[in-house]
């Protein structure tokens, strides 16, 4: 179980380190081209959730994130034992939730910086924690689908 928590801790450290680099070395709104017309590091802040929804609702985010963190830890210890994919999915979500929670507690906003242009579409700016949440949810869905297939296979036998 400790190994899984180390994954979450590593993600939080990477998330907070990258955000610290952006905050300490860039002006708000400043953008650095990494790959022209595709990937930029852009110093951006967000007081809402994904794509700025529920902007400024910090108390709501504190409550929801606390419940989610407790729920993930509970689920990890009660339902994910023995399921490596589900355990990894949960700790990746946990790392992302904690990463953005730290920002909300100490900055009252989330630091975003990964800015991609896909063709002519400017994808919403995000961070490592956001990526962790997205990847974790995808892994969770895959784990759920695989478990359903296993259960169907058992019931047919």
Swiss-Prot record:
Pathway, per record: Protein modification; lipoprotein biosynthesis (signal peptide cleavage)
Secretion signal, residue range per the UniProt entry: none
Membrane topology designation: Multi-pass membrane protein
A GO cellular component annotation in the UniProt record: plasma membrane
Cysteine pairings via disulfide bonds: none
UniProt-annotated catalytic positions: 112, 130
Physiological role: This protein specifically catalyzes the removal of signal peptides from prolipoproteins.
Localization (cell): Cell membrane
EC annotation from Swiss-Prot or TrEMBL: 3.4.23.36
Catalyses which reaction(s): Release of signal peptides from bacterial membrane prolipoproteins. Hydrolyzes -Xaa-Yaa-Zaa-|-(S,diacylglyceryl)Cys-, in which Xaa is hydrophobic (preferably Leu), and Yaa (Ala or Ser) and Zaa (Gly or Ala) have small, neutral side chains
Transmembrane domains' residue ranges: 56-76, 82-102, 125-145
Keyword terms: Aspartyl protease, Cell membrane, Hydrolase, Membrane, Protease, Transmembrane, Transmembrane helix
MF terms in GO: aspartic-type endopeptidase activity
Gene name of the encoded protein: lspA
Family: Belongs to the peptidase A8 family.
Major location (coarse): membrane
GO BP annotations listed: proteolysis
PROSITE patterns documented for this protein: SPASE_II
Name by which UniProt lists this protein: Lipoprotein signal peptidase
């Amino acid at each position: 179980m400790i190994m899984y928590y180390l994954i979450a801790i590593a993600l939080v450290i990477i998330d907070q380190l990258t955000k610290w680099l952006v905050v300490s070395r860039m002006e708000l709104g400043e953008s650095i081209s990494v790959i022209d017309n595709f990937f930029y590091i852009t110093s951006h802040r967000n007081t809402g959730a994904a794509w700025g929804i529920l902007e400024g609702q910090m108390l709501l985010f504190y409550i929801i994130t606390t419940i989610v963190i407790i729920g993930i830890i509970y689920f990890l210890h009660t339902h994910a034992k023995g399921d490596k994919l589900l355990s990894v999915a949960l700790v990746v979500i946990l790392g992302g939730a904690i990463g953005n929670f730290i920002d909300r507690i100490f900055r009252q906003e989330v630091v975003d910086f990964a800015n991609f242009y896909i063709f002519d579409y400017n994808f919403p700016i995000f961070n490592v924690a956001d990526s962790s949440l997205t990847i974790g949810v995808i892994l969770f869905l895959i784990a759920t689908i695989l478990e359903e297939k296993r259960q169907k296979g058992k019931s047919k036998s």
